[in-house]
Regions:
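N-terminal ligand-binding/catalytic initiation module
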Residues: 10, 29-190, 410, 416, ...
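Rossmann-like adenosine-cofactor binding region
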Residues: 267-336, 342-344
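Short, positively charged and aromatic/hydrophobic N-terminal segments
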Residues: 3, 8, 14-32
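Glycine-rich phosphate/diphosphate-binding loop of Rossmann-like nucleotide-binding domains
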Residues: 109, 114-134, 186, 192, ...
Length: 425
């Protein structure tokens, strides 16, 4: 076996990031060198290894006995056992630790609708992160399906093979129907990371930001700019966490009762948010606000707008690669706590803090679903890793490489699954 392919101590299938650097050196750490040309490095890495993932056998097939045990005739016996008791598929196959990363490539971050083939490198990367950060095996599946019904049918067809499904880079509003239908019709966890992974990490960061400024979730006035898939999930998650005063703002202005949006989810948001029924644009929404959360576009928030916010304002500007406002501009406007989606600024809101541990926890108890209680448990598990002594304006969330994160999230999610009755173990 080549040295850059190895088995994990637990013997699980290895989907491993191959290293084009000398043994023992981490590619991920090398890529943190700011002087490196990421585009050039990525092309070289992908071409050299023909992608980033592969399958490594858990067993050795070196003799006739090995062959007869791993394949015919011996393999017939586990097949018979599973036929007698379908739950034994978890006992005799990789299903219990295998996630499908499913995408149709219609909403790839920063690239848009690029199709399934062009989206494959991203899905390979997601599989790498599942394994590297959570020890969860994941397989990228890019499908040529654009309408919701076709994506749903494809996911249902492959579901018997997998312990969970991670939906990725599927455009709105189709993503809502796809996830809701699969959650209802499948008995394995289905999770759209672009929605809920973002929402969980944002909630974790906000929990700690509010601790820094000594405010409570139920008391603060929150403005969210960009109520698409991620923005809508963030609002739902914050409401689950206790937020009561949220205003959503899209390109046409605030959402309110009777706003008559062309998008159904925005009409729903207009009904359940904006308790004071504020009408207008971002300027009107931000007056006296405690928190701004942006999942929208670069430069939409200005220093002058920040000055209209409440004292000790919190700004999460998560448009990538250029945020809604740069940290120095926000600070000039009186913002006290600032977070972005970028690794070169403090307080990076990064989904990798969530999905590896969340699936690890859900799979460990064979959860049928990932419910709100499990999501909120994940958010608090992430937030609580920052102690009172360490918490500050520039340290409200763990770093992506914090080795404690996945295990803490997994334990919290598994506990919540058992407490809410969706665990089978």
């Amino acid at each position: 076996m080549p040295q850059n392919r190895w088995k994990y101590p637990d013997g699980s299938v290895t989907i491993k990031l191959y290293e084009p650097f000398p043994a023992g050196e981490s590619l991920l750490l090398k890529l943190e060198d700011k002087t490196m040309d990421y585009n050039k490095a990525a092309l070289e890495m992908h071409e050299t290894h023909k992608g980033k993932v592969g399958i490594v056998s858990k067993v050795e097939v070196a003799t006739r006995d090995d062959l007869s045990t791993a394949y015919t005739p011996g393999v017939a016996e586990p097949c018979r056992k599973i036929k007698e008791n379908p739950e034994d598929v978890y006992k005799y196959t990789f299903k219990g630790n295998m996630v499908a990363v499913v995408s149709n490539g219609t909403a790839v971050l920063g690239l848009g609708d690029i199709g399934p083939e062009a989206g494959l490198p991203v899905m390979e990367g997601k599989a790498v992160l599942f394994k590297e950060f959570g020890g969860v095996d994941a397989f990228p599946i890019c499908i040529d399906a654009h309408d919701a019904a076709s994506v749903i049918a494809a996911c249902k067809a492959i579901a018997p093979t997998f312990g969970g499904i991670n939906l990725e880079d599927i455009k709105s509003p189709e993503c809502f129907e796809i996830e809701e239908t699969l959650e209802r019709e499948l008995d394995i966890p289905v999770f759209h990371d672009d929605q809920h992974g973002t929402a969980i990490v944002v909630t974790a960061a906000l929990i700690n930001a509010l601790r820094v400024v000594n405010k409570k979730m139920e008391d603060v006035h929150i403005v969210l700019n960009g109520p698409g898939a991620a923005g809508t999930a963030i609002i739902k998650m914050l409401m689950t966490a206790g937020a009561k005063d949220i205003i959503a703002v899209d390109q046409f202005g605030t959402l309110y009762k009777g706003c008559n949006s062309a998008e159904a989810h925005k009409n729903w948001l207009g009904e359940v948010t904006n308790p004071r029924q504020i009408k207008g644009g971002l300027k009107e929404a931000l007056e006296g606000a405690d928190v701004f959360i942006g999942v929208s576009k670069p430069g939409i928030l200005t220093t002058e707008l920040c000055k209209t916010m409440n004292k000790d304002a919190i700004v999460f500007a998560m448009a990538n690669p250029t945020p809604e406002i740069m940290p120095d501009e926000a600070k000039a406007g009186g913002v006290r706590v600032m977070a972005t989606g970028r690794s070169d600024f403090p307080n990076q809101v990064n989904n990798v803090l969530c999905f590896p541990g969340l699936f690890k926890g859900a799979l460990s108890v064979r959860a049928r679903d990932i419910n709100n209680e499990m999501k909120l448990a994940a958010a608090y598990a992430i937030a609580d890793l920052i102690t009172d002594a360490d918490r500050s304006e520039e340290n409200i969330i763990p770093g992506a490489f914090d080795p404690r994160v996945a295990e803490a999230v997994a334990n919290a999610v598994a506990k919540a699954a058992r407490e809410t009755g969706v665990a089978r173990l």
